[in-house]
Amino acid sequence: MITLFGSVIETLGDPEEFAKTQPVLFNSTAIVYLTMPKGAPMWSVYDLGAFSMSLMLAASEKDIDSIPAYELIKYPEVLRENLPIPEDEDIIAGIALGYASDAKINEFRSSRMDVDDILKIIK
């Protein structure tokens, strides 16, 4: 976390900039909320993750930017008060969709591990 926060500071120069985008839900045009039936097998989360990635890739194909974020589902009781989410569904993920502005925060790119450090293919 410290490394990530350090990278944000290097990109933005001001850590407050990053924090400002979250309460306004990243100024997104739309938000997709993904739910799962309560009591669903935990492996269903893998399916939901794959669906999430497919959704974001499809959006990207249409030049629509996306960001999955905890901030979008941080207050599930507020979501339930304002959206028709059944009580027998758990709110699992939120994905903001829209068009990125030229704000400095949108220049931030987190570092990634080298694929050889996380993947081993055995033939």
Annotate each language-model stretch with its function:
Residues 1-123:
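Acidic, surface-exposed loops and disordered segments
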